[in-house]
Amino acid sequence: DPDMIFEIKDAVSIPVMAKARIGHFVEAQVLESIGVDMIDESEVLTPADEINHINKKAFTAPFVCGARNLGEALRRIDEGAAMIRTKGEAGTGNVVEAVKHMRAVNEGIARVVGYHEMGLEAELVQMARNELKVPMEIILEVAKLKRLPVVNFAAGGIATPADAALMMQMGCDGVFVGSGIFKSGNPEIRAKAIVEATYNFDKPELIGEVSKNLGEAMVGINIDQIPEEMLLAKRGI
């Protein structure tokens, strides 16, 4: 409901991000027209297109997209995404999928950098064409930067200050936290603690201190207990 977005924009001074279904470019057009600061092409919503994502280069509003591995990340960047995030498994309070996705992206980057530094250009071309399915120019940019060419945030299952610090130490540029805060016993205190842990991710003493007396955490869900067809992170290509 656009009215809800207008109400939120009027109530806060921080940037407002709204979700559009994967491939639903008209939803994205509407969100851009009402002035959201960023659009999340999100697997949390039922996809509108099972084959194609939104051509994000056709918009002026920046997009964030989820990725489980380097191929998904680079394909979204090639489409125009300004930010990447792990897909995680939203609403579970279980960080295991976000960790898995970040490790996969890091391992993919390490392979690209390794091939490039060893002069194995033929392997890079094959990787770009057959595995990652992106133009060679993006691969070379990753090899040069030794990271993604856009910021990469963690999302999905982050519920504690230690979770946030874990993802930052793994190389994330920041974190998204939703239900891990709002479904906890004391959202305001937990939110502040997660912010502190994100800023001070390499200071375990401080993380331990801000983790005290946060109230009841969101109840975590074991990923193995979720039926295969209900997993959100598998949506998108």
From Swiss-Prot:
Pathway this chain belongs to: Cofactor biosynthesis; pyridoxal 5'-phosphate biosynthesis
Catalytic activity: aldehydo-D-ribose 5-phosphate + D-glyceraldehyde 3-phosphate + L-glutamine = pyridoxal 5'-phosphate + L-glutamate + phosphate + 3 H2O + H(+)
GO molecular function, one term: pyridoxal 5'-phosphate synthase (glutamine hydrolysing) activity
Active site, per annotation: 19
Protein's UniProt keywords contain Oxidoreductase: no
InterPro entries: Aldolase_TIM (IPR013785), PdxS/SNZ (IPR001852), PdxS/SNZ_N (IPR033755), RibuloseP-bd_barrel (IPR011060)
EC number: 4.3.3.6
Alphabetic keyword roster: Lyase, Pyridoxal phosphate, Schiff base
GO biological process: amino acid metabolic process; pyridoxal phosphate biosynthetic process; pyridoxine biosynthetic process
Transmembrane segments: none
SUPFAM superfamilies: Ribulose-phoshate binding barrel
Annotated residues for binding of D-ribose 5-phosphate: 91, 157, 178-179
Keyword presence, Repressor: no
Chain sites annotated for binding D-glyceraldehyde 3-phosphate: 103
Enzyme class: lyase
Any one Pfam family match given in the protein's UniProt record, by short name: SOR_SNZ
Function according to Swiss-Prot or TrEMBL: Catalyzes the formation of pyridoxal 5'-phosphate from ribose 5-phosphate (RBP), glyceraldehyde 3-phosphate (G3P) and ammonia. The ammonia is provided by the PdxT subunit. Can also use ribulose 5-phosphate and dihydroxyacetone phosphate as substrates, resulting from enzyme-catalyzed isomerization of RBP and G3P, respectively.
Protein family per UniProt: Belongs to the PdxS/SNZ family.
Subunit structure: In the presence of PdxT, forms a dodecamer of heterodimers.
Protein name (Swiss-Prot/TrEMBL): Pyridoxal 5'-phosphate synthase subunit PdxS
Species of the source: Methanococcus vannielii
Gene from which the chain derives: pdxS
